[in-house]
Structures are given as structure tokens and as C-alpha cells.
Amino acid sequence: MFGICNLSSIPVRKNGDDKSEMISQLLYGDLYEVIEKKEKWVLIKINFDDYKGWIDYKQFSEIESENHFNELIKNKAYSLDLINFVETYNKELIPIFLGSNIGGSEYIKHTFDGEFSNKIRNRRQLIETAKLYLNAPYLWGGKTPFGIDCSGLSQMVYKINGYKIPRDAKDQVNFGADLGFIEESKEGDLAFFDNDEGEIIHVGILLKNNFIIHAS
């Protein structure tokens, strides 16, 4: 079974339980594969980053077939407004956040009339995207301007600008090239932070003059 997020956002939990921590979010248009169903919960694997977690079955919206799913995967287009909306077939409005994938909106009979990107963008545009998240509150597992965590910020900024990186900082560090010195870095590069044991625990995006935008 396959699904698509047809809501503004859906919490993805560590376990199939209302009290379980939120480890990530589905945003509007995100695609996923169903791995298991348990009572009122569905274990999913998010298509973009293979992240696994549980969502409430009430929020599950099924895609008819694997063929439809594979077609939708090819049709990525990310909204560029801090917040916008899609209109349903019966003229209701659903708010959507920056970085929502509106590429599948027609499939679920929704219309969208806003700015979007479906290509790789340059560093200047990447930095402009990052600055849209300034003053967003910190939220563990969050991926929206209304609540976001450090690796959610880096993943969303890169995603909107056409780059695919993992969900968690400890995995993001393995992508790209290591730089020996800060002087070698450019705006838009990722800066990682470790603890006393050498484990990556935080990530931010480099700006000019070695400033960093991050969520904490």
C-alpha cells in the first residue's frame, strides 16, 4: 500500500501510540509506503528520505496503485511561500507550509495557484530560503516555519532547492565533501557539531562571515 499526505502536516511518531514522541512530520504532498498496520496506527516509510515512523490511520490517504505512486514520485514541485493554501474540489481551503510538495495536488483533486520550484536552485536562493525560517520556534521532529528542529531545517532548505539529504544530522554529515578549514566553506554549506564522544548532535547552515542559521 502507498499513501500521500493530503493534510497540512501529519505527525510521524516513534511508536504507534498517542504519547510517543514525534520524530518527524509529513507535509502536504509527501509520499510514503505502508509497511505495517497495527490497530489505529500505520507504520510508514517516507519516500523522500526512507525515514520510518507511525502515523494515525485516520490521517492515512491511500494511493490507488504502485503505478500511480511511481508517477507521482517524478512530479516534485515545492511551494515557496511561507504559508499558502490548496483548494479542494468542493471549494474548501487547506493551508500548506513552505516546502510542501504540490506536484501531486491534481491527483487528489486539489488546485494550487502559488510560487513553486521543481529544479535545482543556486546558493543565493538556498540562503534566501533558509532566512524564511528565521524566528521559527524549535520543535523536536518539526519541519515547518511554525516549529522545526535543526536537521529538519537543513533538510527542508536543501529539499526546496532541489537537493536530497537525509532527515537526521548524524546521517547528513555523511553526504557531501568534508572541509578541512572554515576558510574553505561557502554560504549554504552545512556546519556540524559533535559532543564529547564525537557523535554528531547538531547542524546549521553557514551564512556570510561564518554566521550560522540553525534551530535550537
Predicted regions and their residues:
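Boundary regions of SH3-family modules and the immediately adjacent low-complexity/disordered segments
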Residues: 1, 24, 28-31, 39, ...
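Intrinsically disordered, low-complexity, positively charged segments
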Residues: 1-41
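Short, structured beta-strand/loop micro-motifs enriched in basic residues and often containing a Trp
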Residues: 8-17, 73-89, 168-176
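Short, conserved secondary-structure segments in the cores of folded domains
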Residues: 22, 92, 178-181
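Glycine-rich catalytic cores of cysteine/serine-nucleophile enzymes that process amide/ester linkages
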Residues: 26-27, 82-96, 100, 136-148, ...
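...with weaker cross-activation on analogous glycine-rich loops/strands in unrelated enzymes
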Residues: 163-216
